[in-house]
């Protein structure tokens, strides 16, 4: 429960900040051009019975704007006079146009009002990333310093990769570290350079691998190589009863050779698949009975040991942490140096996110969509300011990009119509705008339902 509350608090804080500043971008340009803003709210305020839905509100003297906080913490809004938006205030639109309304302003001014929120979110993301660079710098393990190399699945090996290859880069430049961006770059690469046996080898690819498939397949396309060497043993487990010690190396499981901890976990995964089909307790015990070949570090002797794995198929040891032994790169930045570094980092995040959107239109892409639960789970389970701000910056980029998509009801939908008006002189009617917003809003609701339904299905283990 504590973890849930910590993540929920971080999620609400981040979304509140992003929405407040996003709507503040619209508000700033509206005020700049003399457009009246009727309401500026953090959170939504749908009325309940006779209650107006506001936890707090005030209207300064000589101001036409009511400021407030609603009770539904899912965003916020800025209600601009004379604008057809999701509030669908048709009564206001029936009145004669006024000089202080959105609809009477030149198209270029209306365009700035509409892109104001997106502009603020992009600038905010780049600013946060810059301040992260200034406060914490960058810490990572370069792929070229991962001296054990990588472990590849059969698909990767068919393309020319080999276990223990050290990833260097593509035709676009060097890899930085092992992360989602590395998968994206490999999927788009025509050439991947690796260090194999001390020599540089180039592997030719088609530049169109399915990144989502590379990540989701079991075992994955590529992962850091982890030797099957014992680092520590949990007391009371099968491993402790076998007297396994630090430095012991596992060579085989149930007659199948394993040259890495990666292959060991893959073999356990196959047992789990068989356990699903086990119908009796005898079947379960038979599958849990494991024959393990071990070389003991202390004596150099190799033994074949038999044990019964735990009901959840645990042997009970932690492998040697190769990542802890690798050289870590730590880059630090001065205040002014942090801005170009933060902008570069933010741009890489944005380009990676945009490049991954093509997978939304695939079956696996739809299944990978996540709603509020998935987003909330991305925050750390304990309070960590570094991760909080990094996640907030990432969400700011997502909010900005999703809002600029040319979908009616989003900022990008208005921008599309405004650009058409500026180029052709044609201004869509209010009736057309209302219908377009209905369609766009329906699409957004459908997307939210699918994303949050996926969260529910994952929670019950269906997906």
Locations of the language-model features?
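Conserved PDZ fold ligand-binding element
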Residues: 147, 153-179, 241-265, 346, ...
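Internal alpha-helical transmembrane segments
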Residues: 10, 14, 76, 80-87, ...
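Terminal peptide-recognition signature
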Residues: 22-25, 69, 156, 164-167, ...
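Membrane-interfacial segments
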Residues: 28-29, 33, 37, 41, ...
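Hydrophobic membrane-targeting alpha-helices
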Residues: 127-135, 400, 404, 448-455
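Functional transmembrane alpha-helices
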Residues: 2, 96-105, 217-252, 257, ...
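PDZ/PDZ-like peptide-tail recognition elements
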Residues: 114-147, 180-234, 291-293, 304-327
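Small-residue-rich helix-interface/hinge motifs
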Residues: 3-93, 402-424
């Amino acid at each position: 429960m504590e973890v849930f509350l910590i993540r929920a608090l971080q999620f609400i804080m981040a979304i509140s900040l992003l929405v407040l500043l996003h709507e503040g971008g619209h508000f700033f340009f509206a005020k700049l051009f003399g457009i009246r803003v009727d309401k500026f709210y953090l959170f939504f305020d749908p009325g309940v019975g006779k209650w107006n839905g506001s936890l707090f509100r005030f209207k300064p003297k000589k101001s036409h704007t009511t400021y407030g906080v609603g009770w539904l913490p899912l965003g916020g809004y800025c209600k601009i006079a004379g604008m057809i938006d999701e509030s669908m205030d048709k009564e206001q639109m029936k009145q004669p146009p006024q000089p202080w309304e959105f609809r009477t302003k030149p198209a270029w001014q209306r365009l700035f009002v509409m892109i104001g929120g997106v502009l603020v979110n992009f600038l905010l993301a780049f600013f946060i990333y810059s301040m992260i660079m200034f406060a914490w710098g960058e810490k990572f393990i370069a792929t070229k310093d991962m001296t054990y190399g990588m472990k590849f699945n059969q698909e990767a090996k068919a393309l020319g990769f080999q276990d223990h290859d050290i990833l260097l880069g593509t035709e676009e430049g060097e890899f930085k570290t092992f992360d989602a961006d590395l998968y994206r770059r490999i999927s788009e690469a025509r050439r991947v350079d690796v260090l194999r046996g001390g020599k540089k080898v180039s592997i030719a690819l088609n530049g169109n691998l399915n990144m989502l498939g590379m990540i989701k397949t079991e075992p994955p396309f590529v992962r850091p190589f982890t030797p099957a060497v014992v680092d520590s043993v949990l007391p009371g487990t099968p491993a402790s009863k076998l007297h396994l010690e630090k430095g012991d190396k596992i060579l085989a499981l149930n007659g199948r050779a394993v040259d890495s901890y990666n292959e060991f976990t893959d073999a356990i995964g196959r047992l789990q698949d068989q356990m699903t089909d086990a119908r009796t307790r005898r079947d379960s015990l038979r599958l849990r009975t494991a024959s393990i070949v071990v070389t003991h570090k202390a004596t150099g002797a190799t033994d074949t040991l038999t044990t019964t794995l735990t009901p959840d198929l645990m042997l009970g040891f932690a492998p040697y942490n190769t990542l802890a032994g690798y050289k870590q790169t730590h880059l630090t930045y001065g205040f002014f140096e942090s801005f170009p570094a933060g902008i570069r980092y933010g741009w890489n995040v944005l380009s990676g996110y945009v490049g991954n959107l093509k997978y939304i239109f695939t079956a696996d892409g739809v299944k990978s969509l996540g709603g509020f639960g998935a987003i909330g789970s991305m925050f750390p389970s304990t309070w960590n300011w570094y991760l909080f701000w990094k996640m907030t910056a990432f969400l700011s980029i997502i909010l900005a990009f999703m809002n600029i998509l040319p979908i009616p009801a989003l900022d990008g939908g208005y921008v599309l119509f405004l650009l058409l008006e500026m180029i052709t002189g044609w201004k869509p009617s209010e009736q057309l705008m209302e219908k377009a917003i209905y369609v766009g809003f329906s699409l957004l609701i459908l997307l939210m339902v699918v994303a949050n339904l996926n969260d529910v299905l994952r929670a019950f283990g269906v997906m």
